[in-house]
Swiss-Prot record:
MF terms in GO: ATP binding; ATP-dependent protein folding chaperone; isomerase activity; unfolded protein binding
Similarity comment text for this entry: Belongs to the chaperonin (HSP60) family.
Protein name per UniProt: Chaperonin GroEL
Pfam family, one: Cpn60_TCP1
InterPro entries the UniProt entry points to: Chaperonin_Cpn60_CS (IPR018370), Cpn60/GroEL (IPR001844), Cpn60/GroEL/TCP-1 (IPR002423), GroEL-like_apical_dom_sf (IPR027409), GROEL-like_equatorial_sf (IPR027413), TCP-1-like_intermed_sf (IPR027410)
Chaperone keyword on record: yes
UniProtKB keywords: ATP-binding, Chaperone, Cytoplasm, Isomerase, Nucleotide-binding
């Protein structure tokens, strides 16, 4: 396939045009008075959104050279979104400001490599300053604030705060469609997995068709149980305690199942058998999770634990177990809290290491079940377009809130980035030459988001910045929604520190790459051959 090439200044200018086209479409959405963008879809109704990453992802430019620049900005937005769940528009505005200023200097003869070095040093200092300005979330009210700002809705903020309140910081919160017009939170307490009773004869509540076991002993094994002989010793021990028994195994059939059912029907031993959740390696991990949660052991050949040798101490315990046709919920597991914490930390480490999205989701789900429950936010709306938009806002707000819990909050409205210039200012005294110019590029760009927020709300950005910098209070800023100045923390205008940090780091990374680009290579578009027309006599 033949290629087209562009070199030096011509290449960089083409990239800049692509960057500007995407950034100009995205930056009008920044701040409380940002506008919406309507995106045509090849199927279904158009999408109305003010989410930076959604807009950027939809843009594909006709000019292949410009499109390379557009793709780089998309990368800034999606990388920030993946890491922090928000701040995509801020990242785009920062990237555009750094690229514009940087290209001016490269055209004037500055060394791109030294510029990049200066940019990296300045960003490092600014990030340190952001960390200093951050403070930990103090409770439910702060969580509601962060979520409300991200979603642009106090109601959504309250829903997310309620969900987090119930499942804790590590709990899983999922977003699903509601069957009604209402948006509400549904909560599943304890550990739940998608496996029900093997036989309906185990049912204790005929009306609800479910098994309820109070304070049961829990036998956990990764084997298939068919013969009854290995089970007899432990069944006798459990029967003597008068407590019910839950058996979780790869499968229970034949003699083993018959014995459990008969004992239940005779009233000798109330019990229930369910299949183990998951498959393969995931099944082993989930059985181990259940064992740690309930304080039991997995009877497994791999671990050298035989069914015949099991004692009552090897069985798990819980306050209550509910088993339906296709789900089991274990409430109030009696496992050692320290062991549970260690297991959660282990799963957290695995989440950070994995690159697979599916793997990440299953690990997060496992972690939530250990942490104490799953909350589902059911989203309702009158139309499909509204539902899509609302669901998207809730998912974004959820990610931003998690980021805030992780690294704390900073004053919002672009104030933190503006205040972090102080650290870059000190750095400028230490640098010289093109490195100093690189740091100045970052210094200038740090005021771009607040200027854009002010302009979107109809104010003069330069005047707003001057007034903010006249105050010594690091949290003093401008409320663009009401047109007032004041302490951003007191006004509830806050951002997750992780969002602000990620936006700056990702913008600088792409800007540095673009400034050091000398050649663009794209595929030459194929010329469409005209279809020959048929002779007239046909």
């Amino acid at each position: 396939m033949p290629k087209l090439l562009k070199f030096n200044e011509e290449a960089r200018r083409a990239l800049e045009r692509g960057v500007d086209k995407v950034a100009n479409a995205v930056k009008i959405t920044l701040g409380p008075k940002g506008r919406n963008v309507v995106i045509e879809k090849s199927w279904g109704s158009p999408t109305i959104t003010n989410d930076g990453v959604s807009i950027a992802k939809e843009i594909e430019l006709e000019d292949k050279f410009e499109n390379l620049g557009a793709q780089l900005v998309k990368e800034v937005a999606s990388k920030t979104n993946d890491v922090a769940g928000d701040g995509t528009t801020t990242a785009t505005v920062l990237a555009q400001a750094m690229i514009k200023e940087g290209l001016k200097n490269v055209a004037a003869g500055a060394n791109p490599i030294l510029l990049k070095r200066g940019i990296d040093k300045a960003v490092e200092r600014a990030v340190e300053e952001i960390k200093k300005l951050s403070k930990k979330l103090s409770g439910r009210e702060d969580i509601a604030h962060v979520a409300a700002i991200s979603a642009n809705s106090p109601e959504i903020g309250e829903l997310i705060a309620e969900a987090m309140d119930k499942v804790g910081e590590d709990g899983v919160i999922t977003v699903e469609d509601s069957k009604t017009l209402e948006t509400y939170v549904e909560f599943t307490e304890g550990m739940q997995f998608d496996r029900g009773y093997i036989s309906p004869y185990f049912v204790t509540d005929a009306e609800k068709m479910e098994v309820v076991l109070k304070e049961p002993s829990i036998l956990i094994t990764d084997r298939k149980l068919s013969a009854v002989k290995p089970l007899i010793p432990i069944l006798e021990k459990v029967a003597q305690t008068g407590k019910p028994l839950l058996v979780i195994a790869e499968d229970v059939e034949g003699e083993a199942l018959t014995t459990l059912v008969l004992n239940k029907l005779k009233g000798t031993l109330q019990s229930c058998a369910v299949k183990a959740p998951g498959f393969g390696e995931r099944r082993k991990a989930m059985l181990q999770d259940i064992a740690i949660l309930t304080g039991g052991q997995v009877a497994s050949e791999e671990l050298g634990i035989n069914l015949e040798d099991l004692t009552l101490e090897d069985l798990g315990r819980a306050d209550l177990v509910r088993v339906k046709k296709d789900e089991t919920i274990i409430i109030g597991g009696k496992g050692d809290p320290e062991a549970i914490k260690k297991r959660i930390a282990q799963i957290k480490a695995q989440i950070e290491e994995t690159t697979s999205e599916y793997e990440k989701e299953t690990l997060q789900e496992r972690m939530a079940k250990l942490a104490g429950g799953v909350a589902v936010i059911k989203v309702g709306a009158a139309t499909e377009t509204e539902l899509k938009e609302k669901k998207h806002r809730i998912e974004d707000a959820l990610s931003a809130t998690r980021a805030a819990v992780e690294e704390g909050i900073v004053p919002g409205g672009g104030v933190t980035l503006l205040r972090s210039r102080k650290a870059v200012e000190k750095l400028l005294e230490e640098l010289d030459g093109d490195e100093k110019i690189g740091a100045q590029i970052v210094y200038k760009a740090l005021s771009a988001p607040i200027r854009q927020i002010a302009e979107n709300a109809g104010y003069d950005g330069a005047v707003i910045i001057e007034k903010i910098l006249a105050s010594d209070d690091p949290a003093y800023g401008f409320d663009a929604l009401r047109g007032e100045f004041g302490n951003m923390f007191e006004k509830g205008i806050i951002d997750p520190a992780k969002v602000t940090r990620s936006a700056l780091q990702n913008a600088a990374s792409i800007a540095g790459m673009l400034l050091t680009t000398e050649v663009l290579v794209v595929e030459k578009p194929e010329e469409k051959k005209e279809t020959p027309s048929l002779p007239e006599e046909y």
